[in-house]
């Protein structure tokens, strides 16, 4: 197992050997034979004893070892005997040698593990009944399996003061066994050197040295990798036991990455959200917003239909009354008098149902909140608005040019991939835009969009770096396209991507042009033919406007005529609901089986974990019921039929967990030459500059008290939200 050089891992200066991230297969002639309890196994040179054992299905106990972290070798729980060797060895750190016979269950191995476990438990408080890790604790499981049935420790146990590292992670450091997983995660994966050890021997402690908030958008992952109960979730504390909850596999919609998650529920309530393994998207990590914003699902919810009365106040009503009012308006208008805006958390089923509904009244004014330039290729070519290299593809790149984006807070798991490749490979990163605090070193080329013109013409110094690259990537943030010169920026990036693709001589399957989206619904909406941006609605104000989860504030009441009838359909009383004449309560992503498409064009499904609150219903069902009352019944009654319709409109939307290869980059580049737009003098400034801007970006996270505490802790310090411990 390759160790990351200490200097590089801790302060990010040196480079570790190539090939750590994605290794190629080894020729059979180079394999060596070893034996695990007498069973032969062929492994690559450099394979550790632990990896060789796992290859034959033999699980070796461990605390400090983690597959995605560097090897520490400090817990000693993985000690095994090597036949004819004088001493037991640490399986996680010892490379195998040809002909070794590894004895995993010999008396010597058992005695060594028992001794290690005895030392680990010597200072452990043994407070399992009040520990949130109970039931899913490695220390519990391994002490039961490999430990002794009695203790010889009679002395007093040490006690360690708990650290306040913010409103998300609860620390009970007396339980800590100094495995250093959290420290290695912080420095290697998160790229934040906030955690470390102080003292030595019995006085060693893990903490931040100077008490401060753990400033990372990935901080919650240290809860998952902690093998004991030293680091647990503050919002989840004392709420449920793991065996009491029902687990539902789903996906996250807090950003456009589409991280795979597990939703744990009990009695119809979301108790917590955990990561689910997906090697091509989020590996086994999730962002803090994904993990902790679930309390926003319980607050500010729309649970019953509402209508605005004669006094201008919103009052509760029945579904029949609300739908009848909207149906009456729908029957009164047609064509451009009817329009719709889709928000950032809307699923593909609702998008296609709304599209079909408006098409029934001869309207095609269907817009998204996010802008995407229509000039040039616009959204006609799918490759023009996708992360074509894919998220995992970053690990193969040797140069990445970031334009107008801060991936650390717009797409934390994509940023973690960039850091992973930068740390283990010779990845060079450059940024055009406002300087931001990324978790890797980068060359800041400036913040003017005119730099793109210089690079495209070959007059910029960085042009040489791009042309010399073997697998270059250009990543354009969708936030840069919200500007008035968005078309010029997109055209310049398209031109750069095409030129360096030719210069690099990369294989045809390597894609250079990439768009990094910020919201979960955008790609599906563009696939279904929605118009990006609301300019069409501003120019031709409708008489009837549907806001489908539109809470981005892209349009206000002042932008519309006084007689415009607004229908809001969504799950939170956020920005869109207060301006509506009728409110139709919808279901959140944990309450429906729905399709979302991430920034790389991968379709995935959420699953029903809990039922919608009150009288709320799934969005496509509401639209289907409305169509029937309006006398323009949509031709589907079940979810499967809606998905069949999805497949008719855009087949890639029902090819789940598959990234359809996008092409026509040369055509897009040629069309980009037709764009006649000047660059603005304004600098490229991403909307999420600091971690404070990361926590509250949509209707769910804005309703979350936990996310509000995070913002307060960042601005005022962790002590501002300190809560008294109850254990």
Curated annotation (Swiss-Prot):
Residues 30-108 form the 2Fe-2S ferredoxin-type domain. The keyword Protein biosynthesis does not apply. Pfam families: Fer2_4, Fer4_NDSU1, Fer4_Nqo3, Molybdopterin, NADH-G_4Fe-4S_3, NADH_dhqG_C. One of its GO terms (molecular function) is 2 iron, 2 sulfur cluster binding. It catalyses: a ubiquinone + NADH + 5 H(+)(in) = a ubiquinol + NAD(+) + 4 H(+)(out). It is an enzyme of class 7 (translocase). This is NADH-ubiquinone oxidoreductase 75 kDa subunit, mitochondrial. It comes from Rattus norvegicus (Rat).
């Amino acid at each position: 197992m390759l160790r990351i050089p200490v200097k590089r891992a801790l302060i990010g200066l040196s480079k570790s050997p190539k090939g750590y991230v994605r290794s190629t297969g080894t020729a059979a002639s180079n394999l060596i034979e070893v034996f695990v309890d007498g069973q032969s196994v062929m492994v690559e040179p450099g394979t550790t004893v632990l990896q060789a054992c796992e290859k034959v299905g033999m699980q070796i106990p461990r605390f400090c070892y983690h597959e995605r972290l560097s090897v520490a070798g400090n817990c000693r729980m993985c000690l095994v005997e090597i036949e004819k060797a004088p001493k037991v060895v640490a399986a996680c750190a010892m490379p195998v040698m040809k002909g070794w016979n590894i004895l995993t269950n010999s008396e010597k191995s058992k005695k060594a593990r028992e001794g290690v476990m005895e030392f680990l438990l010597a200072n452990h408080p043994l407070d399992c009944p009040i520990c949130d890790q109970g039931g899913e604790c490695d220390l519990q499981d391994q002490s039961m399996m490999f430990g002794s049935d009695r203790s010889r420790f009679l002395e007093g146990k040490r006690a360690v003061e708990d650290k306040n590292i913010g409103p998300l992670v609860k620390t009970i450091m007396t339980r800590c066994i100094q495995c250093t997983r959290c420290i290695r995660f912080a420095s290697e994966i998160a790229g934040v050197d906030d955690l470390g050890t102080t003292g030595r021997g019995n006085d060693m402690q893990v903490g931040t040295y100077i008490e401060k908030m753990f400033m990372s958008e990935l901080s919650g992952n240290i809860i998952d990798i902690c093998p004991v109960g030293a680091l647990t979730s503050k919002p989840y504390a004392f709420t449920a036991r793991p065996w009491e909850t029902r687990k539902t596999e789903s996906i996250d919609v807090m950003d456009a990455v589409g991280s795979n998650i597990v939703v744990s529920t009990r009695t119809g309530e979301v108790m917590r959200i955990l990561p689910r393994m997906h090697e091509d998207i989020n590996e086994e990590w999730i962002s803090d917003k994904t993990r902790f914003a679930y309390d926003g699902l319980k607050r500010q919810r729309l649970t019953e239909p509402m209508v605005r009365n004669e006094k201008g106040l919103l009052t509760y009503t029945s579904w029949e009354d609300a739908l009848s009012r909207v149906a009456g308006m729908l029957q009164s208008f047609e064509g451009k008098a009817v329009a719709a805006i889709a928000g950032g958390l809307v699923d593909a089923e609702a998008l296609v149902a709304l599209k079909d509904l408006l098409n029934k009244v001869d309207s095609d004014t269907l817009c998204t909140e996010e802008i995407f330039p229509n000039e040039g290729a616009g959204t006609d070519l799918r490759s023009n608005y996708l992360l074509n290299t894919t998220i995992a593809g970053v690990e193969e790149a040797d140069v990445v040019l970031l334009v107008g984006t801060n991936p650390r807070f717009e797409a934390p798991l994509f940023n973690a991939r960039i850091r992973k490749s930068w740390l283990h490979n010779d990845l060079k990163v450059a940024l055009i835009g406002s300087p931001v605090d990324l978790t890797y070193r980068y060359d800041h080329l400036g913040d003017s969009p005119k730099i793109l013109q210089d690079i495209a013409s070959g007059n910029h110094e960085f042009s040489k770096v791009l042309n010399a690259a073997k697998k270059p990537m250009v990543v354009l943030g969708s936030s840069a396209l919200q500007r008035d010169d968005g078309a010029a920026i997109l055209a310049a990036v398209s031109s750069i991507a095409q030129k360096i693709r030719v210069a690099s001589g990369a294989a045809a399957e390597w894609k250079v042009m990439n768009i990094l989206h910020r919201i979960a619904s955008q790609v599906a909406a563009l696939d279904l033919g929605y118009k990006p941006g609301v300019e069409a609605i501003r120019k031709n104000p409708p008489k009837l406007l549907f806001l489908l989860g539109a809470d981005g504030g892209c349009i206000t009441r002042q932008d519309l005529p006084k007689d415009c009838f607004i229908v809001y359909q969504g799950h939170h009383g956020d920005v869109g609901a207060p301006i509506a004449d009728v409110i139709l309560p919808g279901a959140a992503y944990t309450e429906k089986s729905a399709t979302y498409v991430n920034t790389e064009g991968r379709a995935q499904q959420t699953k029903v974990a809990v039922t919608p609150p009150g009288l709320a219903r799934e969005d496509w069902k509401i639209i289907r019921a409305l169509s029937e009352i309006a006398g323009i019944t949509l031709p589907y009654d079940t979810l499967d039929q809606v998905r069949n319709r999805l497949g008719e409109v855009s087949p890639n939307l029902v090819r789940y967990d598959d990234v359809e290869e996008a092409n026509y980059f040369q055509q897009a580049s040629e069309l980009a030459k037709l764009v006649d737009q000047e660059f603005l003098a304004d600098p490229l400034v991403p909307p999420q500059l600091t971690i404070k801007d990361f926590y509250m970006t949509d209707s769910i996270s804005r309703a979350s008290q936990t996310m509000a505490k995070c913002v307060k802790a960042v601005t005022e310090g962790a002590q501002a939200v300190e809560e008294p411990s109850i254990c």
